[in-house]
């Protein structure tokens, strides 16, 4: 059971890092193209990406903490 939770926390952390990298790549693309940056869709996507990274990082950290208990 503890091993399963540890595995899940590792996966959550990995997904968090992956989402962060995707966010950085997408963010740099949006910054490079001013037309997309000016559009509301581009801004909304950046906010969504940040929220996704935030949630996945917290979930990974929480699962990691849970595995130690």
UniProtKB/Swiss-Prot annotation:
Cellular component terms per the entry's GO annotation: plasma membrane
Primary localization class, coarse: membrane
Keyword annotations: Cell membrane, Membrane, Transmembrane, Transmembrane helix
Subcellular location: Cell membrane
Residues annotated as transmembrane: 7-29, 44-66
Membrane topology designation: Multi-pass membrane protein
Protein name: Uncharacterized protein AF_0842
